[in-house]
From Swiss-Prot:
This is Cation/calcium exchanger 1. Belongs to the Ca(2+):cation antiporter (CaCA) (TC 2.A.19) family. Cation/calcium exchanger (CCX) subfamily. It comes from the Eukaryota. Expressed in roots, leaves, stems and flowers. PANTHER family: CATION_CALCIUM EXCHANGER 1, NA+/CA2+ K+ INDEPENDENT EXCHANGER. GO terms for cellular component: vacuolar membrane. The chain crosses the membrane at residues 14-34, 97-117, 141-161, 176-196, 212-232, 235-255, 344-364, 371-391, 401-421, 427-447, 479-499, 513-533, 546-566. The keyword Chloroplast does not apply. Vacuolar membrane-localized H(+)-dependent K(+) and Na(+) transporter. InterPro entries: CaCA_antiporter, NaCa_Exmemb, NCX_ion-bd_dom_sf. Keywords: Antiport, Ion transport, Membrane, Potassium, Potassium transport, Sodium, Sodium transport, Transmembrane, Transmembrane helix, Transport, Vacuole. One of its GO terms (biological process) is sodium ion transport.
Length: 570
């Protein structure tokens, strides 16, 4: 109990630091909104090359922070892609202390990654889990649809934002491919090296199925990138690859289940890996079968802890934590038993329409039109809030219209995930302008690593401690997850972007390094696909060492180009 309490204090300390920093950054945001010095705009435009295509090009030609501050205030191309103007904060507030500015923006990057993961874990995934139960989806179908959507939400929305909001499609392409490469090569390689001496084998059919589907998706994507343009029909065809995967998986699961019933043998959970059952379906079944004892024990530990533990420090943490917790809690309807609160539910239903309107108006300007939308959304929110107050109880979540409540929670959790992803992409683009690094490189590395860190920790832990079943779950996740992100995470933005250009075509951003990334990624997949069967599907150190070498070789090549060590014509 002491360790649990100390870990709780540790998490409270982390929450305290994050929220203090959040408040501090809001102050910096408003402090940076002062007008530029008069009489300097025309001179700076002439000196910095006001007609240059990129903001970083103009900034690179300026020396002192004051001229850079005035320049970014005068150039629309240096405007923020999100809600906070990071370039103004860096050059206008921390211009004389760039090291401090770097630390502040790096810390905020960590906060955004935390918020993105916490929103998905605390609001998005519970909504999906409840929806799967209400819709009575089979474990396999829930696994490859809702569970995959929950796990891939950060990548999906970051990609959508980069294509639609920031007009940096190459950023989204690099982040998705970078994440897929990291998981399928670095994470798989790490797993193989760590458990290579344990003689652990995985199911051949499941492995080949997932890798082949991922290779097919990458080949189609490579063809699209090579052509350089995509129509709405091509984008829909690319998106349908995942539908084929789901259909193939469902048919396979149906015949496996029929075979088990005909044999009339009760299979133990240890035999599931040998039957080729999908990882995602297996995870879903595991979740459904978990005993409630563990959850109850944790509840007992925390609920029965003496109130003397509730010190002034914990109260202070709760108060300062409101800037991060309260906005989401008061706009996302939560209908699970553990977190049910009628006041919060009523307020969230009333405010949610206004937040959706704000998100829409932030994309489309027009004061008169926006005012009308705010009035309409406020009226709708008032009516829905009154209905929620009259039809809910304090003691338990609503039993009637549960699907409506769940859809509302799902919609608002999607909204928050999108908003945070938008801010994350905006910050990375600003960091690219500050350091003079292409945003696509940051998407390939920083964003891909940040979104895939959870996969690294979870899959390595499951494989290391779970024996054969754990290795099967981890390896399948390392291929099924990237397949979802590659097809859905890129297919959805391509459909949205090509639909906006219809009946024309959407032009894929020109970036030759994308084909290079695809090539290395496919080499890693082919290495595993060839070597694993030769090793009788055992997770051998040779497999892991080869995958790690491929990834590190690729990463070294890209970083050498970024820092000017290797200069090649591309």
């Amino acid at each position: 109990m002491a360790s649990l309490f100390s870990s709780r204090l540790g998490s409270q300390s982390l929450s305290l630091l994050i929220n203090i920093f959040f408040i501090f950054l809001i102050f910096l945001h408003f402090a940076s909104q002062t007008p530029p010095p008069s009489g300097s705009i025309q001179t700076l435009n002439s000196f910095a090359g006001g007609d240059s295509d990129s903001c970083s090009g103009g900034l690179a030609s300026l020396d002192d922070h004051r001229s850079k501050c005035s320049y970014i205030r005068s150039q629309s191309k240096c405007g923020p892609q999100g809600y906070i103007d990071y370039l103004k904060i860096f050059f206008c507030i921390f211009g004389q202390s760039p090291v401090l500015g770097h630390l502040v923006l790096s810390a905020w990057l960590f906060v955004l990654f935390y918020l993105l993961g916490d929103t998905a874990a605390s609001y998005f995934c519970p909504s999906l889990d409840s929806l799967s139960k209400v819709l009575k989806l089979s474990p396999t179908m829930a696994g490859v649809t809702l569970l995959s959507l929950g796990n891939g939400a950060p990548d999906l929305f970051s990609s959508v934002v980069s294509f639609t909001r920031s007009n940096n499609g190459d950023f989204g392409l690099n982040s998705i491919l970078g994440g897929a490469f990291f998981v399928s090569s670095f994470v798989v390689g790490t797993i193989c090296v760590l458990i290579g001496s344990r003689d652990v084998a995985i199911d051949r059919n499941s492995f080949i199925r997932d890798v082949v589907f991922l290779l097919v998706a990458l080949c189609c994507l490579g063809l699209i990138i090579f052509i350089g343009k995509v129509t709405i029909w091509v984008a829909l065809c690319y998106l349908s690859i995942y539908l084929l995967y789901v259909g193939f998986l469902s048919v396979s699961h149906f015949f496996d289940r029929k075979k088990r019933m005909s044999d009339q043998i009760l299979r133990s959970r240890e035999d599931l890996a040998e039957m080729g059952v999908s990882l995602l379906g297996y995870i879903a079944e595991e979740k459904l079968a978990l005993p409630e004892k563990t959850t109850q024990e944790f509840k007992i530990v925390f609920e029965d802890s003496p109130k003397r533990h509730r010190s002034c420090f914990s109260v202070l943490v709760s108060i300062i934590g409101l800037p991060l917790y309260l906005p989401r809690r008061l706009t996302i309807p939560v209908v699970c038993e553990e977190k049910w609160s009628k006041p919060c539910a009523v307020v969230s239903t009333a405010i949610a329409p206004v937040l959706l309107t704000e998100l829409y108006c932030s994309h489309y300007s027009g004061s008169q039109r926006n005012l009308i939308l705010y009035i309409i959304s406020g009226s709708i929110g008032l009516i829905v809030g009154i209905l929620a107050y009259l039809t809910t109880e304090k003691s338990h979540p609503p039993k009637k219209f549960s699907l409506v409540w769940l859809l509302g929670g799902f919609t608002m959790s999607v909204t928050w995930t999108y908003m945070i992803a938008q801010e994350l992409v905006s910050l990375l683009i600003s960091l690219g302008n500050i350091f003079g690094i292409s945003p696509s490189v940051l998407g390939l590395t920083v964003l891909a690593w940040g979104n895939s860190l959870g996969d690294l920790i979870a899959n390595v832990t499951v494989a290391f401690h779970g024996g054969n079943d754990g290795a099967q779950i981890a390896l399948s996740g390392c291929y099924a997850g990237p397949l979802f992100n590659t097809v859905i995470g890129l297919g959805v933005p391509l459909v949205i972007s090509s639909l906006a250009e219809y009946p024309g075509v959407y032009i894929i951003p020109s970036d030759n390094s994308l084909l290079e990334t695809l090539g290395f990624l496919m080499v890693g997949l082919l290495w595993a696909l060839v070597i694993m069967p030769k090793k009788k599907m055992r997770l051998d150190k040779l497999v892991g060492g080869g995958l790690l070498a491929i990834y590190l070789c690729f990463l070294s090549l890209r970083l050498a180009r970024v820092f000017g060590v290797l200069d090649t014509d591309r």
